[in-house]
Every structure is written in structure tokens, then in C-alpha cells.
A protein has these predicted regions:
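Single conserved hydrophobic/aromatic residue that forms the stacking wall/gate
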Residues: 1-7, 11-12
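Short, surface-exposed helix-loop/turn micro-motifs enriched in polar/charged residues
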Residues: 2, 32-36
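Soluble C-terminal extramembrane regulatory/interaction domains of multi-pass membrane proteins
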Residues: 9, 16-24, 36-129, 134, ...
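Charged, heptad-repeat coiled-coil alpha-helices that serve as long linker/dimerization "arms"
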Residues: 24, 29-31
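Membrane-interface "helix-start" segments
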Residues: 109-113, 141-148
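Terminal helices and disordered tails flanking the catalytic cores of nucleotide-processing hydrolases
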Residues: 117, 144-145, 151, 155, ...
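Cytosolic ligand/metal-binding cores
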Residues: 137
Length: 224
């Protein structure tokens, strides 16, 4: 999908959010069954986060379009790191959408550990890219684009976390997203830590090897 197509869909999303938000607010003032009230609450608490996911997609498409138009590219190391991070982004969005559609609490509970890892990866990648800039491996223009991507990726993960928390809190009469998230991050039970460790192993950004080093390892005979 091109940048212009992504941008054109932004107007559609904005209209949908306005219309859905108005409808849900009006609906919430009626006499609803407990299940209907829960569903209405879930939609009201997540609609803005879904809309913001679209906004960040627009931002990312603009960065990609600018890189293409100006024939700029990242270093091989930066490409590798972004590829790993983008795989994590695909998984967290899939987990979020699936848990929302299926109201799957177990899947929703795996979103926050991945969000935390994505935040850590974004910080690590920023520091690595600063080092490459200092070493002359990347130029300043691509450095700005790299940071823009990381900012949007981190925000996408945060909105996914908000949606997952809303799903987990669906059965709670006292909805407090921020307090719940703070509590989860503080306690970090065995299930949380297990999920985090799995993601940490799966999305390891330390696997990159320069082309020259890879070729050398292939050519050199193994020691017996």
C-alpha cells in the first residue's frame, strides 16, 4: 500500500471513530444488559487506540516514501535490526487484534510483556544507531528517519497494550487502565516473565553479522 493510499484511509478512520464514538455514547445511555454494557465499554475504551494505530501507519508510510524519493537507505546492520523489530510489531498487532475479536484473555495477557520488550529494543536500537552515526556508518538524514520509525513503532506497541488491558479489564466494574498496567509491570508474575523471556529469545537483535565476516566464516575450513 502506497503512502497516498494509507493517508487517504486516515480520513475514513477519523470519520468512523467520530460516528462510532457518538453511537456508543448514545447507546451507553440506554438500558443495556450486562453483556451489552461490557461490550459497549470495551469499544469505548479501545476505539481511540485503534484509530491511533492507523495514524502511526501513516507516519511510517511517510518515512518510507521520503526514503524512496531521496534514494536513501539504511546500513545493513540497521536493516537487520529494523527487520527483527518489525517482526515483533507484526506479532503484537496480531495478538492484539485476535484477543480483541475473540475476547481471549490468555492472548491479551501476552501483549504487555511483548510491549515491554519492544520498548527495550527501541531504546537499544537508538543507542546503536547513534554509535553508527559517530562511526560514519550512517548519515544524519537516515538517522532522523531511523528515529522516526522507532518512535512510531514504540507508540504502536503502547496502543496495543492499551487495547489488551481493556480486554483484561472487561469483567471489572472498576476500570482503571493506568493503575492496572502499573500493577502488572510491578508484579511481573511467572506467566509474565515466561512470556517476556520467550520474546526476548525470539527477537534477538544481536544476530547480525557483517557480509565480510559471514563470507570469511564460510570460506575458512573448520578446525578439527
Amino acid at each position: 500500500m502506497t503512502s497516498s493510499l494509507v493517508g487517504s484511509e486516515m480520513c475514513i478512520r477519523d470519520r468512523y471513530e467520530d460516528k462510532l464514538g457518538t453511537y456508543l455514547m448514545q447507546l451507553s445511555m440506554h438500558d443495556l444488559t450486562p453483556d451489552q454494557a461490557k461490550q459497549t465499554s470495551k469499544f469505548l475504551h479501545t476505539i481511540s487506540d485503534f484509530e491511533r494505530l492507523g495514524d502511526h501507519a501513516v507516519n511510517i508510510s511517510k518515512v518510507a516514501q521520503e526514503l524512496h524519493e531521496k534514494s536513501r537507505t539504511f546500513s545493513e546492520a540497521a536493516k537487520y535490526e529494523l527487520d527483527v523489530l518489525e517482526q515483533a510489531l507484526v506479532e503484537i498487532t496480531d495478538l492484539t487484534v485476535n484477543s480483541f475479536v475473540d475476547e481471549d484473555l490468555n492472548t491479551a495477557a501476552t501483549v504487555e510483556p511483548l510491549r515491554e520488550l519492544i520498548g527495550i529494543l527501541c531504546n537499544d536500537l537508538k543507542m546503536r544507531h547513534i554509535k553508527r552515526l559517530r562511526n560514519g556508518q550512517c548519515d544524519l538524514n537516515t538517522g532522523f528517519a531511523f528515529n522516526d520509525l522507532l518512535t512510531n513503532y514504540e507508540r504502536i506497541a503502547a496502543h496495543c497494550s492499551n487495547i489488551a488491558v481493556a480486554i483484561l479489564e472487561l469483567d471489572s466494574s472498576n476500570f482503571d487502565m493506568h493503575e492496572y498496567t502499573k500493577s502488572v509491570r510491578k508484579l511481573k508474575d511467572d506467566r509474565y516473565l515466561s512470556a517476556f523471556e520467550k520474546y526476548e529469545e525470539k527477537y534477538d537483535i544481536n544476530g547480525y553479522r557483517p557480509k565480510e565476516e559471514t563470507e570469511k566464516r564460510i570460506i575458512e575450513p573448520k578446525e578439527k
